[in-house]
Amino acid sequence: FDLTAGNLGLLAGGYFIGFSLMQIPVGLLLDKIGPKKVIGYFLIIALIGTISFALAKSFTGLFVSRIFIGVGVSACMMGPLTGYRVWFAEKYQQRANSWMLMVANIGFVSSTLPVQILLPYIGWRWIFILIAILILFSLILIFLLIPNWEQKESTSIKSEKESLSQIWKNKFFISMIPLAFINYGGIQAIQTLWAGPWMLNITGYTPLQSATGLFWINITMLISFFIWGYILPKISEYGISSIKLIKLGLPISYFSLFLIIYFGNNAGAFLFTLYIMTSIVISLTQPAIALNFSKNLAG
C-alpha cells in the first residue's frame, strides 16, 4: 500500500475510534462480569481484527480492521485497573498501575527496532500474524490464570444510568477530564503515532535511526514505570498525594514539550524521550479516579 500521512492518521484514528467508543459499555461490563470474561471476549475481537488486517487487500480493509482491533483491546487497560481496585489494598493501586504500564511498554518496545529488523525478512503481514499468535497465547493465559469475578445481580438500565450519572457529576472526575483529553491523549498520539514520522521527515533520521529512537524512548518509559511503581507507595507514606505529584510534574512536562517546539527541526529522540518521561505523572490519574469511587463502580 502506498499510504500518505493522512492515511496513516486515519488508521491510527480508526484504532482510537474503536477503543474510545467502547469505554462506557466496557466499564459497565467490567463491573458486572469482571475483567477475566470481558478482556477475554474482547480480545477475540482483537484477534479477528489483527488477522483481518494482515489479510487486507485495500485501505478500507485496513481501516475497518483497525477499528476492530481498537474495539478488541478496549478493555485491556481498564480491565486490569478494575481488578486491581478489588484485588489490592489502596496503597498498592499506584504501583499495580505503573507496573501494568511498564509491561505495556514491552509491547511498544517490540514494535520499534525489532519490527524494523524483521520487516525486510518477513514483511508487515507476517508481523501481524505473529501478533495474532501472541494474542491467542494471551487469551489462553487469561482464561487459565485470572481470578474469577463474583457475579453481580442483574441491574436495570435505570440503575446503570444512575451509576453513570453519579460518575459524571463527581467534581473530582470532572477535574480530571482535561488531563485525560489533552495531556494523556497528546502523549499517546506522540508516543504511538507522531514521534516516528517527526524524526523521519522533520529531523532527518533514517528509518533505522527513527526506529532506534523510538526503541530507546520506550525503553526509558519501561524503566521509568518500574521505578515509579516501586517508589510510589513509599512517597505516599510521607503524605504526598497523587494530585500533588501531578501538580509538581505537569509544569516540567509542559517545559519539555516547549523544548520540542523551540528546537523544531532539531528536536530528536532525546527531547521526545524527555517529554514522555516527564509526562509519566499523568498515569496517576487513572488509579486516583478509581479510588475516588466505590469498588462496585471501578469499571
Regions of interest found by a model, annotated:
Residues 240-285:
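C-terminal transmembrane helical hairpin of 12-TM major facilitator-type secondary transporters
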Residues 171-228, 286:
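Extracytoplasmic gate region of multi-pass secondary transporters
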Residues 21-59:
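Conserved MFS/SLC helix-loop-helix module at the cytosolic interface between two early adjacent transmembrane helices
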Residues 147-177:
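Juxtamembrane intracellular "pre-TM" segments in multi-pass secondary transporters
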Residues 99-146:
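Helix-loop-helix hairpin linking two adjacent transmembrane segments in secondary transporters
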Residues 49, 60-68, 270-274:
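Paired small-residue
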Residues 22-34, 225-240:
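Helix-to-loop junctions at the C-terminal end of transmembrane segments
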Residues 59, 65-103:
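Cytoplasmic helix-loop-helix junction between adjacent transmembrane helices
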